[in-house]
Structures are given as C-alpha cells and as structure tokens.
Amino acid sequence: MSNSKRTAAIIVAGGRGLRAGAGGPKQYRSLAGQPVIFRAMQPFCTHAEIFAVQPVTSPDDAEMFKLAVAGLNYQPPAPGGATRQGSVRAGLEALAADAPDIVLIHDAARPFVDAALISRAIVAAQITGAAVPTIAVTDTIKQINAQGDVVATPDRARLRIAQTPQAFRFDVILEAHRRAAREGRDDFTDDAAIAEWAGLTVATFEGDVANMKLTTPEDFVREESRLGALLGDIRTGTGYDVHAFGDGDHVWLCGLKVPHNRGFLAHSDGDVGLHALVDAILGALADGDIGSHFPPTDPQWKGAASDKFLKYAVDRVTARGGRIANLEVTMICERPKIGPLREPMRQRIAEITGLPVARIAVKATTSERLGFTGREEGIAATASATLRLPWGTNGLAD
C-alpha cells in the first residue's frame, strides 16, 4: 500500500533511564560504538515515507543530544514533560502547526527498530487509524496478589507484548492526549492505552523480537556482546584521489561547494575528498574501486555529484549487514585553506553517510610547496575507512 498521506515520527527521549545504571541517561549511552538515540532515530530520519522526525528531549540534555545525533535531519527538539505521557503530548503539539496525517511514536530506548517495522506501522495506521506492534508471549504469565501469591494464570495465547513505534491518525491521538490532560489523567504507560481510554479501537500488527527496549545494565551488557560478536570481522581500506585545476570559480571538497579562483578538470564534480572515501570503503570491502563502479567513460556520470558515489559505497556496506566504524580523509593542498571548512566538511560527510560526526575525521596538510600540489596545479586527498562486517561475508554486495 503506497503512502499518499504525510507521516511524521516522534522520538520520546526525555526520560532519565535510572534503571540502566550509571553513565547518564540511557538514550545517550554508547552501544557498540553508536549512541542509543542515534540508532533509534536514524531509521526514521532515512525512511522515504517520513517527512519529519520530532524529538522530545530534556532541556538539560541539549548538548548531549546535539552531539549524539549529529548528521541526522530532524525538527528542533520539543522540551519533554514530567512524564512520558507529557513528553509525547509536547511532541504532538510541536507537530500540530504543520500537522501530518499519520504519526508514529517511538521510544528512544528501542535502538533496534528497522525500516520494515516502520513501513508496517505506517500501513497499519493508514488502514486502522490506531495500531500497535506486538510480539507473542512465550513464557507462562502469573498474576499475583499483594503478598506475592499466584492468583491466576492468564491464557498466553491471548496476550501480546506491546512495542513501539505505535501508529495513529494524528488528529485522533492528539485529541486523546489533550482530553487526558484536561481530565487530569497522567497514568498511562503507552499511547495505545490512551487511545483505548478515549474509545478508539486499537489494532495490532507484527512487531519484531529484535526491537527490544534497553532498561537495565544487563540489557546493555548483553547487547554489546551480541553486536560485537555479530560484527567481528574488522576491515580497513585506504583511498587516494587527485584532480588538476582548470577554469572555474569553485571546487567541490568533501561535499561542499568551495569558492576558488580555479575549478577542477574532472568527469564528475571532481570532489577528491569524497572520491578518496569511496575508494577506501570499497577497498575495505574488496569490492573494486570508484572507477570500476562509475567508469569515467560512462556519460551518465558526467558532472555527477559525488555524494551519490559515497551513498552508493555506504549502501554496499549495509547490503552485507555491516557498518562503518570510522572515516578519515586528509586533504593535501596549498589553497583553499581547509581549516575553516573542517567542521562543515565533517557535518556534510555525516549527512551523506548517516554516521555520527564523532566517527568522521577531516585533516589537512600541504606538501611544503613541493610537487604539483605545492605548485597549486591541483588537489590530492587520502582516506581510510574502518568497517565492521559479520563473520563469513566475502566483502562483496550481492
């Protein structure tokens, strides 16, 4: 079912996560090298059917949040409330000025959500208006009294474990939250419960066993171990590119259009920084080089923007179930000066690759006036990429 309706997502990240132990709010803790909240937000930020991602955070965490999700595109964070329910309402109100048709509400403490689950949520909301992802209960459940004695054994065939993202028509869930606030009801533990209370029929759709919520220190230990074991094949690749100057008034460097008194002589846009990164990633995959995937003899790549090449290389990693641990590029030139451009370059590479800025390094050097770069005849770049792949992969995308 195609999505002709506008869909937004709310990421609830205002909690303190005290049960997860020391180390700050759990959504900002690192999990196998990436912040939990980055993992939770990225699938929504990159999903083709979602036009806006609205985080809800504690104002006290502003700097932590900014660093943790650098490179992702999202709405300005809404300040969280005293409860999860209050935080969700704040996110809904923040979206109301440009109201979507459908809204997905997801907990930042669930970092294993994927695009398939998000797509199922969107379709479920389109069909039913209110839906929650669930998984089957596999353990026997006991109901107890205040003394801890068993008083009942519910039929587990009729029980389900609820997850997020929960999906709703925006207008109905906003009104349900507003009504709950007016009536002083602040005791709901999820948004489906508010919808039920408001008289809505809440449907279920297929959740994902992997989409677990991180709650305790043991959860972090277990998932660190699992992710480390899954991605234990560590690869490193290097790349190099050079382009001569020609006529022009700008050059493309690391995804930025940089004013200059010369241009590049190149088949594509000549971005030596991104080209070197592409070669480094492909080299780590043992998957050829940029010229084998984008031949300079092919007219379709004439003047092409090099961010397409880098996105392609990143997709090759993803296709093997891997991820990029670190990218580094060194620009070698006399001019333009790279220092003032370093942080914008890191940000742009983060936007293209979906990596946290903390995993991207941009460096610069000169050749001390020696050679073609010293004579300002062109610019060179070297790069390295460190990848983590599942054991048993051959490094080649299918």
UniProtKB/Swiss-Prot annotation:
SUPFAM superfamilies: IpsF-like, Nucleotide-diphospho-sugar transferases. It catalyses: 2-C-methyl-D-erythritol 4-phosphate + CTP + H(+) = 4-CDP-2-C-methyl-D-erythritol + diphosphate; 4-CDP-2-C-methyl-D-erythritol 2-phosphate = 2-C-methyl-D-erythritol 2,4-cyclic diphosphate + CMP. GO terms for molecular function: 2-C-methyl-D-erythritol 2,4-cyclodiphosphate synthase activity; 2-C-methyl-D-erythritol 4-phosphate cytidylyltransferase activity; metal ion binding. The record marks R19, K26, H267, T366 as: Transition state stabilizer. Pathway: Isoprenoid biosynthesis; isopentenyl diphosphate biosynthesis via DXP pathway; isopentenyl diphosphate from 1-deoxy-D-xylulose 5-phosphate: step 2/6; Isoprenoid biosynthesis; isopentenyl diphosphate biosynthesis via DXP pathway; isopentenyl diphosphate from 1-deoxy-D-xylulose 5-phosphate: step 4/6. InterPro entries: IspD, IspD/F, IspD/TarI, ISPD_synthase_CS, MECDP_synthase, MECDP_synthase_CS, MECDP_synthase_sf, Nucleotide-diphossugar_trans. It holds the Pfam family IspD. Keywords: Isoprene biosynthesis, Lyase, Metal-binding, Multifunctional enzyme, Nucleotidyltransferase, Transferase. Its EC number is 2.7.7.60, 4.6.1.12. GO terms for biological process: isopentenyl diphosphate biosynthetic process, methylerythritol 4-phosphate pathway; terpenoid biosynthetic process. Its cofactor is a divalent metal cation. Transmembrane segments: none annotated. In the N-terminal section; belongs to the IspD/TarI cytidylyltransferase family. IspD subfamily. In the C-terminal section; belongs to the IspF family. Bifunctional enzyme that catalyzes the formation of 4-diphosphocytidyl-2-C-methyl-D-erythritol from CTP and 2-C-methyl-D-erythritol 4-phosphate (MEP) (IspD), and catalyzes the conversion of 4-diphosphocytidyl-2-C-methyl-D-erythritol 2-phosphate (CDP-ME2P) to 2-C-methyl-D-erythritol 2,4-cyclodiphosphate (ME-CPP) with a corresponding release of cytidine 5-monophosphate (CMP) (IspF). This is Bifunctional enzyme IspD/IspF.
